[in-house]
């Protein structure tokens, strides 16, 4: 159903999905606020002793390797094991893959554990698939269009959904390719918007897991929600500081009509 993604925000707000975030220290507060704004419940449970059990009761799990330590690597591995055992959808955000050997090895092992979704920029997705070297730090040096093959490779390997963010977002799963035009350039000037999107994606997958909304459409909805909110925020703010606040407000206030009017979605046959 072409517009099924429009129904997903209502489910998120109605169910308040619990999202376990194993994410980087730079973005933790912003990520938690973004989840609260969309109607989800954040939990930053990342220690090895607790992450397995918590992944079993969470509705969704985010694995983000932005600022990893030895303890967090262990916690992420345990959370993946717990999510897999419980059938909890988990999202892999491969921050900085390609440039650092230990991080890249961990992230590539994680791919083989079948995340429900992978979300990254074009250079991260290309590097994760083994088709490129990665970007410049956490910034992409590849265009989204250059990552189509890599996204399809990863979707086949995991059986899940792969999202590539950029000026136009790409969402790929086995048999489907969607292009989503939304967002605003100001999003790139606020640290943590991409990382928060990974958490929002986990919330959407958790809220829609036992519904007739396909995981592909849930991932589209997550990206549409943040992108539309980004556009609204740009009309209310003139600089990055005020934009960050306006973005949280817009995430909370977004309604179905705004989502439909501020999102341009097209499906492509490949």
Curated annotation (Swiss-Prot):
Indicate the enzyme's highest-level EC class: transferase
Cofactors named for this entry:
Mg(2+)
Tell me the Pfam families matching this sequence: HK (PF02110)
Known catalytic reactions: 5-(2-hydroxyethyl)-4-methylthiazole + ATP = 4-methyl-5-(2-phosphooxyethyl)-thiazole + ADP + H(+)
Q: Which Gene3D superfamilies match?
A: 3.40.1190.20
Residue positions annotated to bind ATP are: 119, 165
Pathway given in the UniProt record: Cofactor biosynthesis; thiamine diphosphate biosynthesis; 4-methyl-5-(2-phosphoethyl)-thiazole from 5-(2-hydroxyethyl)-4-methylthiazole: step 1/1
Mind listing the GO molecular function terms for this protein? ATP binding; hydroxyethylthiazole kinase activity; magnesium ion binding
Task: Report the EC number(s), separated by commas if there are several.
Answer: 2.7.1.50
Could you tell me the superkingdom of the organism this chain comes from?
Bacteria
| GO BP terms | thiamine biosynthetic process; thiamine diphosphate biosynthetic process
**Does the record carry Oxidoreductase as a key word?**
no
Q: Which UniProt keywords apply?
A: ATP-binding, Kinase, Magnesium, Metal-binding, Nucleotide-binding, Thiamine biosynthesis, Transferase
* Cross-referenced CDD domains: THZ_kinase
Please identify the protein, giving its name as recorded: Hydroxyethylthiazole kinase
């Amino acid at each position: 159903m072409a517009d099924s993604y429009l129904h997903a925000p209502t489910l998120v707000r109605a169910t308040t999905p619990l999202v376990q975030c194993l994410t980087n220290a730079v973005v933790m507060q912003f990520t938690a606020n973004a989840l609260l704004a969309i109607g989800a419940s954040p939990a930053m449970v990342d220690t090895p002793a607790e992450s397995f059990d918590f992944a079993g009761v969470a509705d969704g799990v985010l694995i983000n390797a932005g600022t990893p330590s030895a303890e967090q690597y262990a916690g992420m591995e345990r959370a993946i094991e717990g999510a897999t055992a419980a059938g909890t959808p988990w999202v892999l955000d491969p921050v900085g893959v390609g440039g650092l050997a230990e991080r890249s090895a961990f992230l590539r092992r994680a791919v083989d554990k079948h995340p429900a979704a992978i979300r990254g920029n074009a250079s991260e997705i290309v590097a994760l698939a083994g088709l490129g070297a990665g970007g410049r730090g956490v910034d992409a040096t590849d265009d989204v269009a250059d990552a189509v093959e890599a996204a399809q490779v990863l979707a086949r390997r995991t059986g899940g959904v792969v999202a590539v963010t950029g000026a136009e977002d790409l969402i790929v799963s086995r048999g489907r390719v969607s292009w989503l035009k939304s967002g605003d350039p100001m999003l790139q000037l606020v640290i943590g918007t991409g990382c928060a999107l990974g958490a929002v994606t986990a919330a959407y997958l958790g809220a829609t897991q036992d519904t007739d909304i396909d995981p592909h459409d849930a991932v589209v909805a997550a990206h549409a929600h943040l992108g539309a909110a980004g556009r609204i925020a740009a009309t209310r703010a003139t600089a990055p500081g005020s934009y960050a606040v306006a973005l949280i407000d817009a995430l909370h206030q977004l309604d179905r009509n705004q989502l439909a009017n501020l999102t341009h979605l097209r499906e492509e046959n490949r």
